[in-house]
Amino acid sequence: MRHTGLVHPQSLPLGLAAIALTLSACGVFTETTERAGEVADERVQDAFEEIESEPNEDFPIGTREENPVDESTPDGSTEQLDEIIDDVEASEEEPVELLPAPEITLREIDGATPEVIEHIANVEAFWTEVAVELDFEYVEVDVDRLFPRSTIGDDGEDTCSFRRIVEPLDADVAEFNAYVAPCSEGITVVWDDILLETDLEERFPGVGMAMLISHEWGHVVQLERQQVNQSDIVAEQQADCYSGAYAAWAEDRGIEPFTSDQALDFAIISTLETRDAVGSRPEAFGAHGNGFDRVRATQDGYDRGVTFCDGYDVTPPPVTQTGFTTARDRQNEGNLSFDDSFELLVPAVVDYYESLSSESLEEFVDEPDERILRNLHATIGDLSVGTEYALRYGAALQEANGDAIAGVGPALQRACLAGSFLNDARLNGIEVEVPSINDPTELELTTLTLSPGDLDEAITTLTSSDELLSNPGVVFEMVAALRVGTLDGIDACALA
């Protein structure tokens, strides 16, 4: 959150920095992480300019025209809470009949693990099958253009030519990264099998690399189809969308690792954690998007398939990511101090939920322990405090209304209600009374507004909450419900 009027010197730079992980994987043409950026950014930008300046007869990918990012306020989601609940209940009641899995050919890829080789084979089988929906014929990436970082040597034998620029593939660029490049030698895919693959396998076994590989192949398809006129952030979220479509396809066929509800949970959380650093501008070179938008794109693909993802070219998705507008926000990453979060945000949450009830919710609410709140604030950010209270007051509201609070349906409604609070804050701001800067004994009104990172803080709080400990396997649906409330407000939350 941020003040629109007053400066509070006691606000400390706590929050999202503690969990903004360095998994900013991928990019068409080559996108580097912070650690590799100093090595490669200038060279990669030169390569971009080379590609954009004139046609490439060896690999005609077209020109990268302006495709402005749509930073307008999202005009609403496409489903209501009751639709999400119906889908969950139907999946619990109806036995799933799997579709036949395709026969795959496991190609020898120098240095690649058997798991990654299988991921690549499955993703290529997916594109071979669904390409007809997009009216093109998928062409497999040449096995000699698939490079784990561990195989990139110092001898310069493995090159990527951008017409006048001939460069050896650089292991430093691949560090904790993955990328796709339109080299004259052929579309080239590089991934870090030393650090990144190990990290993903430890935290999201199987699923992390499957999502990474399927995302990169989204870029492969963009190049094969010459979809190179989008802004970077739209290209990246289209690749996220294609990745989500692959997850659904694999799940329908019982293809590992998408054979359990937990796999889909891991897919969403790993996507959330590969977001851009908080406060990044959406129009920046190599921008991927905040977690809120990247998860939305992944869920678009899972729910709607590759044809919908393809439409990103014509109608870019709504972008909620914003950059910092003041040096103060940048310094504290848009976060209030814990004391300000507790004293300003919590009463706002309480007032919002009380306005939804005909009786006081005080006797129904299970107040969180301060230690829990301080830990959330320190590891996630200021809005985690407000989100935790929103989830608890959602349960209090349900109980006061005589509704059930146990089970997946009520949990999804609480997530939607928490999102509706964010919707209200996004549209109207939060008016609070704070001590005047000129005279601390006097109070004056100021307005809190959502800052960059707040929506991601809400999702992260949700994915680590008791709601999911009590309802394992529904991260996908919980995040979707939160988004419905955030974009459509209270009317979408099926509140009696």
Show the residue positions of the predicted features.
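C-terminal motif of bacterial Sec signal peptides marking the signal peptidase cleavage site
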Residues: 22-25
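Bacterial signal peptide processing site
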Residues: 27-30
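A metal-dependent hydrolase signature that marks the N-terminal structural subdomain at the beginning
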Residues: 32-165, 307-365
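Catalytic zinc-binding patch centered on the HExxH motif and its immediate surroundings
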Residues: 150-190, 358-379, 383
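Short pre-active-site segment immediately N-terminal to the catalytic Zn-binding motif
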Residues: 194-211, 227-233, 375-387, 404-408
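Catalytic Zn2+-binding segment of zinc metalloproteases
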Residues: 217-231, 250-251, 393-408, 421-427
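An active-site-proximal "capping" alpha-helix that borders the catalytic cofactor pocket
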Residues: 233-249, 409-424
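Long, well-structured alpha-helical subdomains associated
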Residues: 250-312, 425-496
